[in-house]
Amino acid sequence: MLLLFDVGNTHTTIALTKDGKSFDIKRVSTHSIQTEDELYVFLKMFYRNDFKDIVVSSVVPNINYIFEFFAEKYLNKKAIFVSAKEYNEIIWNVNTPEEIGADRVVDVIAASRDYGKDAIVVDFGTAITIEVLKENRYEGGVIIPGFNMMVNALFKGTAKLPKVELKPSDTFVGKDTGSNIRIGVINTILGGIDYTIERIKSDYDLKSAPIIYTGGQSKLIREYLKKDIIYDLELGLRGIYYFYENIAC
């Protein structure tokens, strides 16, 4: 069994898998586990200690040592960390491939393996990323503030606007300050994504490319999805598995 970690800025997804198709998933706050010993105690509650390897996709480099120490101390193994430069089945057509976030790398890998050589991926996390895959070449992407980042910016940058909890709305105009913020944030982000995708389709001749939405925050906008959009919450986990498959061969 492989032990996979998808370490995000806010939450970490932990998954156990044998084949990269089905996953036994747990989720924790990223900064709730501070040491390799705490990680061991947490995992022991749910999993047997029979891991073939440990593979980590992390966008929080200052806690990577926890996974390194855990693998060495409790598994007598070296943790494997996702990076674009280690994966050779995709051409990383950007200035500095080593700077591509691991979360983006695994999204692109899984999109390529599961949906074809052309794809557009939108990952709704703390920040929202849009990835462009053209003929199995990663052409780059876009990063925009996530839902909660925009809410927090309004709250911290003004004297009176409240911090609200986001939820879908069936109207485009709010009747109170809270609904004004909710509608404004969600519609601004969705409108920006729609515009960006249309430009990408036109500029890169990707009019028939599949569009995949993923990431924990995508649940907020699931009911707004157009019929041609694919909703795939396990895209990143499969990407981690495919990365391991590639480098283990």
Swiss-Prot record:
Active site positions: 103 (proton acceptor)
Binding residues for ATP: 6-13, 126
Catalyzed reactions: (R)-pantothenate + ATP = (R)-4'-phosphopantothenate + ADP + H(+)
Cofactor binding note of this UniProt entry: A monovalent cation. Ammonium or potassium.
CDD domains assigned to the protein according to its UniProt record, in alphabetical order: ASKHA_NBD_PanK-III (cd24015)
Key word Metal-binding present: yes
Positions bound to K(+): 123
Required cofactor names: NH4(+); K(+)
GO MF entry, a single one: pantothenate kinase activity
GO cellular component: cytoplasm
Family, per entry: Belongs to the type III pantothenate kinase family.
Self-association and partners: Homodimer.
Biological function: Catalyzes the phosphorylation of pantothenate (Pan), the first step in CoA biosynthesis.
HAMAP family: Pantothen_kinase_3
UniProt-recorded name of the protein: Type III pantothenate kinase
Taxonomic source organism: Thermosipho africanus (strain TCF52B)
